[in-house]
Curated annotation (Swiss-Prot):
Domain of life of the native organism: Bacteria
Name assigned to this protein: Glycine cleavage system H protein
Organism of this sequence: Halothermothrix orenii (strain H 168 / OCM 544 / DSM 9562)
Gene Ontology CC entries for this record: cytoplasm; glycine cleavage complex
Family from the record: Belongs to the GcvH family.
Entries under PROSITE patterns matching the protein: BIOTINYL_LIPOYL
Keyword Electron transport: no
Function: The glycine cleavage system catalyzes the degradation of glycine. The H protein shuttles the methylamine group of glycine from the P protein to the T protein.
Gene name in the database record: gcvH
Length: 128
């Protein structure tokens, strides 16, 4: 299972890459494998605001429809619109071109609620 060290993680299998007061958010390798082939992605609008753990996107796969939850509260600065035409990028490159949104962090203290790569890897061992 691919768990990059430079990211933080949630128990719902989202990742976040923080850069100053902004961050990229996506779903983990584990999540995309569990979902199967992604066939549709519903993304929020730029300037939409979400609280921590609030659903902000929907991934539809051949197996299921799944909500994606924001690891920390924030305002959407950019949505990865390439996924609207190529939803399979979530499967192919979940940590690169398969990212979902870029957000402006509302409260950096919420990052303390997230798991490091080591903690997430241990968590995956428990759930598998």
């Amino acid at each position: 299972m691919n768990v990059p060290e430079n990211l933080m993680y949630t128990k719902n299998h989202e990742w976040i890459k923080v850069d100053g007061d902004t961050a990229l958010v996506g779903v983990t390798d584990y999540a995309q494998k569990e979902l199967g082939d992604i066939v549709f992605v519903e993304l929020p609008e730029v300037s939409d605001e979400f609280a921590q753990s609030e659903g902000f996107a929907v991934l539809e796969s051949v197996k299921a429809v799944s909500d994606v939850y924001l690891p920390v509260g924030g305002e959407v600065l950019e949505a990865n619109e390439e996924l609207l035409e190529n939803p399979e990028l979530v499967n192919q490159e979940p940590y690169a071109s398969g990212w979902l949104v870029k957000i402006k962090l509302a409260d950096k203290k919420e990052l303390e609620d997230l798991m490091s790569s080591e903690e997430y890897a241990r968590y995956l061992e428990e759930v598998e």
